[in-house]
């Protein structure tokens, strides 16, 4: 079924590409059609492979990047029209600021994981709730949102979901009554900062926007949306929350306290000091002119030295498939940008909006939200970054930063709509499935889609009113 839908989508796009190319005459007539069409097809094929989970997303990106380079060095040697992207251009297309920022934060979080602090946080959340399931859900959403803003939403979900499932089973409620609020809160909380969500990392690296800029501009709407989420989760799961599932709260607290405790207080103290140092460097980005990746890698190296953690073990904790995925994706998008496809997409947006700033803001946020629900928001954001750069140049009188906020809000909040919309959704669904609590695509949409729509309506109003 997935393959059939993917094939239909791919054929439809192949039919539409000539129409897209035909409208490119007014942008750059010097660019030959062959590399534009090939880079466009590769980009679409990779999207389809990722969106319908036909192969692992890292393998899909590797396939796309290697195809571009192979064609460029074989057919391109005989016909320059097939020189899609040179090897040097491919290396230049990779944003190593993003790669090293992710690597540094992965190392820091991996060391923190060994202290047991994340499991302890889950236990403390239940203790604060005093056995009240709805109160527990609110606390978990707040904790998840804050951790996602300070670390990143994928890591937060990876660490908290297994503990959340166990707590739900102890309380005898469906795990998804707690997992859903956590996923949604994670994506919303991650929106508030530069490092909270992978799309934000991509946007921040390309635009030069600082940690402070993200926090001050997106933090307020993240908080507003989180409050709306709390109300929506009660609407969807109130029956579960009202059930009296466990009358022996003191006994349960004793068990959780025994099992979910801080394993290494000294190491945790070191981690918190270093993490605080890194966050301070993020805040001082404008003054120091320091890239976030330098702050993250510096913190990771300091923590490795003072904690005396085995370097081999920590490198094993780095999510290399994710880093390779990003690098290959940069190459694919770089090829599409170099060969005129990205300006073509941007020109379509310009024509639809009539170069009106307000219309452009609305179009960017809603297209981003809709597309992020269909494909993972990471590859979509990577492909939209050059589009926004182009729009900032051709839309008269527009604040150059507002379209970045539009893209970030659309990609981050739109990702809540479906399982494949955001990496944190996929991670949580995978953990739940391995525990025997799989969720169907359509069941996820029933809750995720309303949350995404409400979030994007609030975001649109926020941007138009504030800016």
Task: State the predicted function of each range.
Residues 82-174, 320-394, 400:
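Membrane-embedded alpha-helical segments and adjacent helix-loop junctions characteristic
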Residues 25-35, 52-58, 83-98, 211-221, ...:
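Interfacial loop-to-helix junctions that mark the boundaries of transmembrane helices
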Residues 48-55, 143-152, 183-195, 284-287, ...:
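Transmembrane alpha-helix interface/packing and boundary motifs in multi-pass membrane proteins
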């Amino acid at each position: 079924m997935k393959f059939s839908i993917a094939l239909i989508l791919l054929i439809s796009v192949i039919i539409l590409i000539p129409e897209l190319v035909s409208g490119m005459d007014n942008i750059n007539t010097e660019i030959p059609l062959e590399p534009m069409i090939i880079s466009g097809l590769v980009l679409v094929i990779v999207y389809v492979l990722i969106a319908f989970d036909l192969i692992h997303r890292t393998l899909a990106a590797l396939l796309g990047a290697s195809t571009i380079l192979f064609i460029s060095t074989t057919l391109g040697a005989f016909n320059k029209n097939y020189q899609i992207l040179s090897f040097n251009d491919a290396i230049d297309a990779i944003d190593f600021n993003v790669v090293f920022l992710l690597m540094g934060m992965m190392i820091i979080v991996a060391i923190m994981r060994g202290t047991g602090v994340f499991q302890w946080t889950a236990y403390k959340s239940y203790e604060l709730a005093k056995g009240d399931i709805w109160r527990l859900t609110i606390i978990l959403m707040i904790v998840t949102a804050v951790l996602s803003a300070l670390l990143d939403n994928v890591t937060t979900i990876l660490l908290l979901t297994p503990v959340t499932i166990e707590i739900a089973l102890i309380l005898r409620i469906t795990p998804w009554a707690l997992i859903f609020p956590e996923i949604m809160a994670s994506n919303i909380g991650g929106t508030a900062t530069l490092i909270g969500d992978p799309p934000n990392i991509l946007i921040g690296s390309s635009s030069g926007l600082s940690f402070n800029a993200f926090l001050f501009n997106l933090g307020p709407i993240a908080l507003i949306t989180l409050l709306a989420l709390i109300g929506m989760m009660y609407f969807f799961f109130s029956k579960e929350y009202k059930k009296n599932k466990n009358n022996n709260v003191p006994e349960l607290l004793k068990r959780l306290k025994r099992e979910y405790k801080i394993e290494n207080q000294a190491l945790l103290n070191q981690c918190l000091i270093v993490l605080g140092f890194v966050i301070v460097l993020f805040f001082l980005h404008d003054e120091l002119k320091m890239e976030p990746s330098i702050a993250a890698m510096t913190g990771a190296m300091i923590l490795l030295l003072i904690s005396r953690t085995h370097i081999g073990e920590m490198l094993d904790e780095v999510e290399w498939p994710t880093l390779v995925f990003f690098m290959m994706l940069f190459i694919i998008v770089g090829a599409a940008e170099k060969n005129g496809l990205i300006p073509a997409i941007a020109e379509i947006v310009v024509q639809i909006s009539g170069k009106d700033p307000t219309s452009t803001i609305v179009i960017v946020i809603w297209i981003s939200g809709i597309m992020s629900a269909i494909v993972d928001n990471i590859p979509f954001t990577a492909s939209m970054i050059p589009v926004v750069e182009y729009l900032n140049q051709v839309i008269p009188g527009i604040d150059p930063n507002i379209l970045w906020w539009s893209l970030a809000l659309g990609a981050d909040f739109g990702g809540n709509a479906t399982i494949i919309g955001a990496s944190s959704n996929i991670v949580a669904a995978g953990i739940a499935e391995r525990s025997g609590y799989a969720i169907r695509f359509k069941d996820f949409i029933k809750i995720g889609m309303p949350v995404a729509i409400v979030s994007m309506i609030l975001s649109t109003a926020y941007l138009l009113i504030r800016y």
